[in-house]
């Protein structure tokens, strides 16, 4: 009986000690998440904490995850201390991220800390264990020297766990979809094709490629924020990313831009700079390219800048195609104000253009006909029979 009591008491004491250790370690994980944590405050707790490397929070984060995902200014001394206590760099949380992946989402990325968090080795089965591809290139303040190190020396590439890899995107395509791509980083990525990194940096760059290029990705990924940078667009264009490139549906980068609520004429000029055919008619297909003029393809409010309209007209395309682009294919709605303004430009220049328009629009409705008549076109049986 006495022996039983002794063993029971020993068991209770052991449980209490284990609970105390767990409680202390969980407290430390919470403290590492505290924005006010400092090396001086946390050093003793880390050094005296038993089995710190074994404890994980409910999100799968170890002590390194907790600290490097903190919004504070990460202290390299704390990172070194945690590593010295055996906290794993290759531990993955419930999101599948190692501490390096968690840290790269941080707003203050430091190269020295990234170097500490990188881990790469071959196990007994000669399998490479590495976390290098966990690094997220979308960090706003990524250091250019760090980027060169990661790409050239460490061979970073899009993670196999992302849709980017499935879709075969290169680093340039991925980087331009980040919230604030920097021109100097983008330029280095574009110029880095000379390095043998084991995969293509850029895909679908040329006119013959019927798939999205980096301009398509950049414009479409910033539609919600409406935040396009002229410098980024110039950087892409100046480094052979084609403004003539068409996606799988045949759309140009400029057509992606027409869906923005606010259209900047300077960006339009960049995307039309090399004689882009914005009004091309594909054979007998009714698909027309001047989406800017067509209400169907614009967001609310639908505003039209006549200076941009003039840019479209000044291309080598015919007025007929421009006018067709104004109309909606699935309704009888027209922007008569724009039609009238466009026709005024040609009133004294070439009446044959207006005549051609009249023949094309006779079956659409008398409002369009009135606009044409008001701008100098005359009805005659001879012309109507043409």
From Swiss-Prot:
Residues that span the membrane, as ranges: none
Superkingdom in the source lineage: Viruses
Entry annotated with the keyword Repeat: yes
Keywords tagged on the record: ANK repeat, Repeat
InterPro entries: Ankyrin_rpt, Ankyrin_rpt-contain_sf
ANK repeats: 59-91, 95-126, 210-245, 249-280, 292-321, 349-381
Keyword presence, Repressor: no
Listed name of the protein: Ankyrin repeat protein C17/B23
Annotated organism of origin: Vaccinia virus (strain Copenhagen)
């Amino acid at each position: 009986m006495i022996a039983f009591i002794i063993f029971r008491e020993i068991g209770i004491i052991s449980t209490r000690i284990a609970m105390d250790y767990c409680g202390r370690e969980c407290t430390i994980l919470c403290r590492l998440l505290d924005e006010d944590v400092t090396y001086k405050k946390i050093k003793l707790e880390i050094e005296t904490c038993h089995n710190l490397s074994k404890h994980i929070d409910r999100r799968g984060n170890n002590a390194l995850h907790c600290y490097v995902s903190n919004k504070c200014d990460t202290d390299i001394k704390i990172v070194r201390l945690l590593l010295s206590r055996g906290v794993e760099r290759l531990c993955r949380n419930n999101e599948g991220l190692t501490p390096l992946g968690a840290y790269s989402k941080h707003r203050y990325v430091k190269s020295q800390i990234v170097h500490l968090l990188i881990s790469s080795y071959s196990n007994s089965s000669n399998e490479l264990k590495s976390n290098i591809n966990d690094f997220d290139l979308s960090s706003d303040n990524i250091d250019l020297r760090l980027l060169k190190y990661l790409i050239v020396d460490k061979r970073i590439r899009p993670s196999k766990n992302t849709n980017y890899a499935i879709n075969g995107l290169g680093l340039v395509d991925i980087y331009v979809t980040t919230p604030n791509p920097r021109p100097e980083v983008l330029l280095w990525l574009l110029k880095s094709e000379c390095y043998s990194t084991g995969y293509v940096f850029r895909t679908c760059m040329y006119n013959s490629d019927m798939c999205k290029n980096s301009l398509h990705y950049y414009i479409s990924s910033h539609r919600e924020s409406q935040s396009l940078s002229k410098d980024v667009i110039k950087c892409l264009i100046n480094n052979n990313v084609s403004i003539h490139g068409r996606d799988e549906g045949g759309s140009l980068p400029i057509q992606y831009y027409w869906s923005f609520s606010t259209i900047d004429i300077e960006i339009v000029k960049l995307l039309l700079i090399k004689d882009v055919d914005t009004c091309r008619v594909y054979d007998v297909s009714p698909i027309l390219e001047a989406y800017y003029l067509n209400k169907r393809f614009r967001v609310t409010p639908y505003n039209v800048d006549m200076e941009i309209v003039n840019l479209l007209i000044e291309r080598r395309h015919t007025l007929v195609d421009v006018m067709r682009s104004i109309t909606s294919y699935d309704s009888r709605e027209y922007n008569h104000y724009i039609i009238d303004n466009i026709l005024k430009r040609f009133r004294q220049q070439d009446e044959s253009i207006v005549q051609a328009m009249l023949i094309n629009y006779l079956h659409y409705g008398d409002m369009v006909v009135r606009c044409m008549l008001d701008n100098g076109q005359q009805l005659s049986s001879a012309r109507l029979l043409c």
